[in-house]
Amino acid sequence: MNNPVASPDIDPIDRLTILAAALPGAAVRQRQITAPFDAVWRVVADLEQATPRYEPSVAHVRVIERRGELLRLLVEDTAGREEIMDAKLRPGWCLMQSATVVVAFAARPLGSQTLLAHLEHRRVRAPLPSQSGSHHHRAAEEKIDQELQTIERLAIEGEK
């Protein structure tokens, strides 16, 4: 079976765009980061140490199982709730998902810089009647923009 999201021949940013199209309501943002790909990807791939530094709702991440590119994570949020996530991690591509959320990163070199895309999607979000879907989506995009800025700062600091 041809799975376009799994194909290694597809540019990772394009792969993330395909994934976003399959997840209605997913928030996706991109940022051109003024750091080389290796420095940026080192931050993204350091799930245990870096994730709590750029993701405000995450307190701890622990890799509890690793089989090549496939990982099982135990993620604790800032309220103390734990959730198991399955992840696929390889250079330029990180997909993490649980029963409630899908999170993905895609990156590619852009000269001496990096193009980094980030997707977040809640699987079980039922909007309240008084809640504006577009307001929630804008807030999610603003949150992702902040996360991408923090990843850029961490990548630049790591290069020093």
Tell where the protein language model's regions lie, with residue ranges:
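Hydrophobic ligand-binding cavity/cleft-lining segments
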Residues: 1-65
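Soluble, non-transmembrane catalytic domains of enzymes that act on hydrophobic metabolites at membranes
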Residues: 2-7, 78-80, 98-105
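Short, hydrophobic/aromatic-rich segments at coil-to-beta transitions
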Residues: 3, 49, 66-73, 88-96
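Hydrophobic/aromatic beta-strand elements that line small-molecule binding cavities or substrate pockets
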Residues: 29-30, 61, 82-89, 101-109, ...
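A short, structured loop/turn motif at beta-sheet edges
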Residues: 34-38, 66-68, 90, 107-115
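Hydrophobic pocket/interface hotspot
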Residues: 40-44, 50-51, 73, 87, ...
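Helix-adjacent hinge/juxtasegments
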Residues: 72-85
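Beta-strand/loop substructures that line and gate deep hydrophobic ligand-binding cavities in soluble
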Residues: 95-153, 157
